[in-house]
Amino acid sequence: LIQERKGDPKDDLITKLIEAEEDGDRLTEEEMGHLVSAVLVGGVDTTQAQLAHGIRLFAAHPEQWTLLARKPEEMAVAAAEEVLRYEPITPLTARITLEDLDYRDVHFPKDTVILACALTANRDPEAYGEAEAFDITADRGRAKPLTFGAGPHFCLGANLARAELEEAFAFLAPRMKDLELAGEPVYDTPLGVHGLHELPISFSRAADR
């Protein structure tokens, strides 16, 4: 596909990567391949897992699903953001300190491996107010969830994942009535991508859809 775009440029990501240049330096084909793979993985497998968590949350909070179903286009962005905040599929991420660091009276020497918990950070009441409540109408201020990480290792597929979740929620909510859990969900390991192995649900199809 990279070779194809070199001969026939399009208005797409691969063409933009081919044309990208900084101080005369361009990406190699190997680097482009890694970047495209990272975007696809970040926007497909992980999004499927996050969507499953979202459906589970809405099944457990039917009043929120009803709110979304009434105004799907208007509420989809807030719904996706609240799902990402409340139940991230990457609850634990590893980081390495690049220099000695002192934080809240704890000393971390350079090259210390730190396991950061986005799940806990995303429910910090100092940042999100009533953080333990799953509420798509809540004003969370300017705080952004740490679900996608931060800094140099911020998730490359973040924007794609958000767009896919918003589209899915806007499409499903007005079509799936009476959404509820039909059994106990079975979770995958919390390490890496924390998805759902099984998610029993029941719903009825909206008559006008």
Where do the protein language model's features map onto the residues?
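Cytochrome P450
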Residues: 1-209
